[in-house]
Amino acid sequence: MNKTEILLSCMFLNDSEEMIKRSHITSDTIIINQCDEDGYKEEHIGSAFVRTFSVKERGLTKSRNLAISESVADVCIICDDDEVFSQGYEEAVQKAYSSLPQADIIIFDMAGRPHKWGDSIKKLGYRDIMSVSSWQITFRREKLLAKGIRFDENMGAGSGNGAEEEFRFLTQCRKAGLKIYHYPYELATVAQTQSTWFKGFDREFFVNRGNTTRYIMGLPLSVLYAAYYAFAKRKQLTDISMFKAFSYTLAGIKENRLYKLNKGNN
């Protein structure tokens, strides 16, 4: 049986017991609490053995990576502080991995959100993973470690470079030969809380979008995607035109900030 562990990222957590109970967590959990002090504690909350790491550093992807490095599980479940897990989720995840021994990463459904692949078990390709959110992601930890894959710390909430860190993470997994599958089970419900990074479709959003898409896709595909994305979002744009959105995205593609950051860190 695959041992599972939830990797929960949060900020300024005061009561870990309340968090665990509110989220209906019943399995072992690592909490990365980004706050203003460093600390560590262990506690048993119901059936869950919970290890909480309090750290001063900021950034969602840094939180994810710390949790991965501290985990001792076979299978890890990515989690934020606004999720409520379905009853029996741990057994469902274990069943999914037992029935798909070839899967290195399994993407689950979220209650109240579109089920893109219906009730089918499906191996996911490049286009499929573009719409995956972090809450849906589970993975075999040892497979990730063996390939040296982590979340890109230049991306995600707190980085100043926008989001799409899940897409970057999954594309790196695919490039490394890891197999990604969808399994039809509603893992959790996600609250409709305000995003920590999305402030609307403004200039900053589209410039960041251009930077991230070029970083992940490369130059030719990112330009094509910029045109598609501006057109797809045209009805949601209130303060800028579709053509402005496209031009801002192109500005981000030209800036190529993330590539330069990554190159400077290596």
Label each region the model flagged.
Residues 54-71:
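Glycine-rich, basic loop-to-helix element that forms the pyrophosphate-binding segment
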Residues 1-28:
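N-proximal low-complexity "stem/linker" segments adjacent to membrane-targeting elements
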Residues 200-266:
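Non-catalytic, C-terminal membrane-associated alpha-helical segments of glycosyltransferases
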Residues 76:
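Short aromatic/hydrophobic "clamp" motif used to bind/position activated sugar donors
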Residues 84, 88-121:
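Conserved donor NDP-sugar-binding/catalytic core segment of glycosyltransferases
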Residues 143, 154-183:
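A short, conserved alpha-helix in the catalytic core of glycosyltransferases
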Residues 122-143, 160-162:
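A recurrent flexible, glycine/aromatic-enriched loop bordering the glycosyltransferase active site
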